[in-house]
């Protein structure tokens, strides 16, 4: 038992880290949504800055321990004690190891689905199917203008935040934490901008459309090598002090 680190005990779904990614391809479409929609899902003590969402399609052809897979989801720009970062709201992917590892280690909100990134002539197309239902379609022009590398690197180096939830065996809460993590050892290989469009459709189990698209702000397409760093707990919702402080000030945000 001294060597146990993940489930199943004798044959875990993923190895210990570090987790290095090579030629990781991103298509990120930033769009404006309603502040009310964000307030319903962003938990305290995170703060919403502008009512923006980053919808991401990510192709990971080569990663240590996790293999070859594709992912998509929504990241919300937030602040934590004055520090700007991103709250990872939803993630959908097609590989068991990063789903198990992401949920167990960090608390990534990962679900099994079928995201795709394809290059069709002069357009990059990203899609998300949950079962047979098409839930998201993103399209972007192919490499129209080179993006500012410093801005892309700064966005990659910013902190990201997660809510890690693990229930007790009796069904009650056992772990409920705000986790912060970083991407490290980043090598940006190329970065491009172009016009983009995004369509989100309702689905009961893939509710990306609950953060509606009002207008597109920007889009960036890039490739990078990077390491997914392990996390740190910055807020424990179940500690007596934090439970009292949060419930006294913003009780609705604990439930979010």
UniProtKB/Swiss-Prot annotation:
EC number: 4.1.1.4
Catalytic machinery residues: 110
InterPro entries, alphabetized: Acetoacetate_decarboxylase, Acetoacetate_decarboxylase_bac, ADC_dom_sf
Pfam (any one): ADC
Catalyzed reaction equations: acetoacetate + H(+) = acetone + CO2
Enzyme superclass (EC): lyase
Gene Ontology terms for molecular function: acetoacetate decarboxylase activity
Gene3D superfamilies the record matches: Acetoacetate decarboxylase-like
Keywords associated with the record: Decarboxylase, Lyase, Schiff base
Role description: Catalyzes the conversion of acetoacetate to acetone and carbon dioxide.
Family that this chain belongs to: Belongs to the ADC family.
Protein name: Acetoacetate decarboxylase 3
Organism: Mesorhizobium japonicum (strain LMG 29417 / CECT 9101 / MAFF 303099)
């Amino acid at each position: 038992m001294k060597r146990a680190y993940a489930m199943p005990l004798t044959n875990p779904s993923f190895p210990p880290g570090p987790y290095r990614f090579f030629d990781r391809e991103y298509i990120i479409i930033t769009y404006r949504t309603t502040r009310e929609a964000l307030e319903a899902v962003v938990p305290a003590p995170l703060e919403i800055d502008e009512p923006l969402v980053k919808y991401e399609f990510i192709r990971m052809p080569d990663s240590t321990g996790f293999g070859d897979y594709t992912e998509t989801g929504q990241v919300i720009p937030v602040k934590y004690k004055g520090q700007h970062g991103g709250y990872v709201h939803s993630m959908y992917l097609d590989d068991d190891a990063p789903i198990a590892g992401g949920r167990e280690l960090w608390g990534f909100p990962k679900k099994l689905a079928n995201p795709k990134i394809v290059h069709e002539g002069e357009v990059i197309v990203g899609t998300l199917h949950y079962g047979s239902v098409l839930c998201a379609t993103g399209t972007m022009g192919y490499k129209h203008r080179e993006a500012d590398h410093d801005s892309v690197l700064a966005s990659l180096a910013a902190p990201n935040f997660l809510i890690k939830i693990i229930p007790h065996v009796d069904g009650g809460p056992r772990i409920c934490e705000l986790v912060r993590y970083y991407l490290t050892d980043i090598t940006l290989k190329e970065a491009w901008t172009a016009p983009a469009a995004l369509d989100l459709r309702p689905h009961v189990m893939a509710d990306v459309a609950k953060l509606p698209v009002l207008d597109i702000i920007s889009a960036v397409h890039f490739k990078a090598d990077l390491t997914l760093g392990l996390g740190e707990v910055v807020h424990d919702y179940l500690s007596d002090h934090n439970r009292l402080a949060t419930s006294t000030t913003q009780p609705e945000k604990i439930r979010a």
